Amino acid sequence: MANKTNCIRNGKKYYRLRVDLGRDSNGKRIRKTFYGQSKKDAENKLEKYKNGLNSGLTNDYDKLTLGNVCKLWLFEKVKNTIKPSTFERYEGIYRLYVKTSPLYPIKLKDLKSLDIQRYYNDLFNSGKSSSVIKNLNKLLKSFFNYCIDEGYIVRNYCIGKSITIPETSSVDENKKDDITVFTLDEQNQFINAIQNHRLKALFLLDLGTGLREGEIIGLKWNDIDFKNCTVSIKRAIKGVTLIEGNKRQYHLIEQTPKTKNSIRTIPFPENLVPILKKHKLQQKEEQIKSGSAYTKNDYIFCTELGLPIDPRNLRRSYERVLKKYNIPYKKFHSLRHTFATRLFENGVPLKTVQMLLGHSNINITANIYTHVMPPEKFKAIDKINSIFDMK
């Protein structure tokens, strides 16, 4: 039997649907209330709830905890709808900041925004950065949207003024502290250091295009247009930990680039053409030498057996060059930052840099590189060939 009424909750109008769902395992009568923006909305939530009973949820709705439902949502609902690398990040947030948190055992019916705010404050006071808390809040916001759709809660505790993310007093903690670039002297020192390196072409192409690590590893020969000096980014190689049950295993996977804007065709310095062609000849020699042990994947940059390069090994190889030639340490990603910085130093427009880097919007580019953007009128992209002195 259902009782349908209009009501006001938290200052907002809802349609309320109360139903009798029988009795629980102790013989106690179960009455459940669903809220919706309309009668149809509330009825849909009731139907979803009933369907959920067949997928592991119990009639004892009041016993559902944030942790148990979040785990079910993440591993059964979300996992197969996102990239493996994205799921790896979500799972890490869940494992580190939900699974062992004081929020985990709280029943959804008892959850308050104050519980979440208190936990965020504790994380911040224990030394966790604002960015960590923002990422956690983003995950919980998506989770609570799911809970609303299922009728477990009526509002999202992570939206609006309910929650305040603790902030540091430092300016833009996520960006400026992480931006390190090669000076012109260091850039030239690095270029000289890799002249006889097996991955010389990779390092120079990255310095001359600003590709992300996974993007440059994922390049294939048919992505290169030698005539027009362009490279098309269509895929990325990622090292991810895949989770099946209680097992965690590291794999290299090929997936689409980071965002839609990351799928792009961009120019590269024309003085890299002979370097890339020489690299291709050396690759063919490795193929002949390896014989049947060689795997033909058409990757521009691969192991001596034709397999994709593990990002971890690429970083190690890069870092060995820095150490051997006493070049101040910088992350591999600094090649990308150096590319962008050189463009700004030479007056290339912000919008053009955004397009070349594949950022999803221009604000990302502006926020990262504000400190190097010149105040004078921007110039055209054809400067790219003169900026980098590739040898």
Where are these regions (language model features)?
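Short, basic/aromatic-rich helical patch in the C-terminal catalytic core of site-specific tyrosine
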Residues: 17, 116, 140-144, 216, ...
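N-terminal core-binding DNA-recognition domain of tyrosine site-specific recombinases/integrases
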Residues: 34, 74-152, 308-313, 328-334
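A short, basic/aromatic helix-end/turn motif that makes direct DNA contacts
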Residues: 218-224, 354-360, 370
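N-terminal DNA-binding module of tyrosine recombinases/phage integrases
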Residues: 10-16, 21-114, 279-295, 374
